[in-house]
């Protein structure tokens, strides 16, 4: 009996440390669904479904940094938007619904970019589609052995789709796995844009210090305003090399340094790799965030950078952000223009979903601790029970426990 009691006393802290759990919590004034274990925490939002927080739990402020963008202004639940009340805060543009609730990682669906016509604007369709501005309701929370899984979903009444996610965090691991379904409620086949928009903000996103690595090949800079574009508009890209707005060679790994500027360039993911990746870190923080996703579902990735160039409400020339936008579509130009573009480098710029069909994709985000002077990422590979990051130049490897099947 004494031996049994001693064993229980020994195991209790181990069992507690190994738990993954779920609870509801306010996050910057928003309704949050929190999944966490002893060392890792993820918060998804009821408004828009955004993943607003992916971070280590630590008493070290630098290690516990949240890489995701949290706006400098107060956001609201976007499905509670009232124009007469909120336009004064978020503008009267088609971006207002998204701006009112925009935080962290959002789903751009069924369009990527602005509405395609004035008719869509009049019908209150805004930037990046309906998915990031509606209510995402919790359905259930499962506790399979060693993990917690949140099921939440949203109805898209204007565009006649349904979206659903299962978000999983396992005990002891700094990995979140997301399964995502889209159901076409219409009887006919339809073209869509389906893009994940992972947005990073201060202090993690800082010009000159925030560094990207990605399994991409070639691309093109968007045709944005040349006065504020930090890169040469329309210029070709061979990753990681680009051209600055004054025609000089520039590395695209670093968040571009020029102030009061922004840029967007699209990249074709390496089609020879079944699993694509990107990673990001700040030179002064011991944290690397990475994403893994099937290349077949996500042939494109865009690097959007904003450095205090947008002076409209609610941005007011104060926003610093870097967004990695991976999915079916290279440029945030709206559904109609992506269909008219058709292909880029021979690869489609949109996809079809059949009438009454339900389709699935999945992606994984992870955190890793990195040492001072970390040189960046040469490669990321998935092995049984772990994700392995190889450092550029040194060949040193960092292993992240991952017992959840990836794709």
Q: What is each PLM-predicted segment?
A:
Residues 1-2:
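N-terminal secretory signal peptides that target proteins for export/translocation
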Residues 5-14:
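Bacterial N-terminal signal peptides
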Residues 19-177, 188-407:
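Surface-exposed acidic/polar loop and edge beta-strand patches at domain peripheries
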């Amino acid at each position: 009996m004494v031996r049994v009691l001693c064993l229980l006393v020994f195991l209790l802290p181990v069992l507690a440390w190994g738990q993954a759990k779920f609870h509801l919590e306010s996050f910057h004034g928003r309704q949050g669904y929190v999944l966490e274990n002893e060392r890792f925490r993820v918060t998804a939002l009821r408004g828009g479904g955004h993943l607003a927080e992916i971070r280590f739990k630590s008493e070290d402020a630098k290690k516990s940094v949240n890489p995701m963008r949290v706006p400098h202004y107060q956001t609201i639940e976007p499905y509670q938007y009232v124009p007469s009340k909120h336009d004064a805060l978020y503008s009267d543009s088609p971006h207002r619904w998204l701006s009112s609730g925009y935080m962290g990682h959002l789903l751009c669906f069924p369009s990527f970019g602005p509405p395609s016509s004035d008719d869509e604007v009049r019908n209150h369709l805004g930037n990046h589609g309906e998915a990031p501005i509606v209510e995402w309701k919790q359905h259930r929370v499962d506790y399979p052995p060693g993990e917690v899984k949140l099921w939440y979903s949203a109805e898209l009444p204007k565009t006649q789709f349904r979206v659903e996610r299962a978000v999983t965090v396992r005990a002891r691991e700094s990995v979140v796995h997301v399964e995502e379904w889209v159901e076409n409620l219409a009887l006919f086949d339809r073209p869509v844009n389906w893009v994940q928009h992972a947005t990073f903000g201060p202090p993690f996103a800082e010009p000159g210090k925030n560094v990207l690595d990605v399994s991409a090949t070639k691309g093109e800079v968007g045709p944005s305003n040349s006065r504020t574009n930090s890169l040469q508009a329309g210029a070709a890209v061979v990753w990681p090399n680009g051209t600055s707005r004054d025609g000089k060679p520039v590395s695209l790994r670093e968040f571009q340094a020029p102030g009061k500027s922004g840029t967007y360039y699209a990249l074709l993911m390496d089609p020879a790799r079944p699993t694509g990746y990107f990673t990001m870190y700040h030179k002064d923080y011991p944290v690397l965030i990475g994403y893994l996703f099937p290349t077949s579902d996500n042939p494109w990735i865009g690097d959007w950078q904003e450095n205090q160039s947008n002076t409209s409400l609610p941005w007011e020339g104060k926003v610093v952000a870097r967004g990695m936008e991976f999915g079916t579509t290279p440029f945030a130009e709206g559904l109609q223009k992506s269909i008219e573009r058709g292909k880029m480098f021979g690869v489609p710029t949109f996809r079809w979903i059949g009438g009454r069909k339900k389709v699935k994709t999945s992606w994984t985000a992870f955190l890793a601790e990195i040492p001072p002077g970390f040189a960046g990422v040469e490669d990321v590979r998935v092995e049984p029970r772990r994700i392995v990051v190889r450092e550029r130049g040194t060949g040193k490897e960092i292993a992240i426990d991952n017992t959840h099947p990836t794709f």
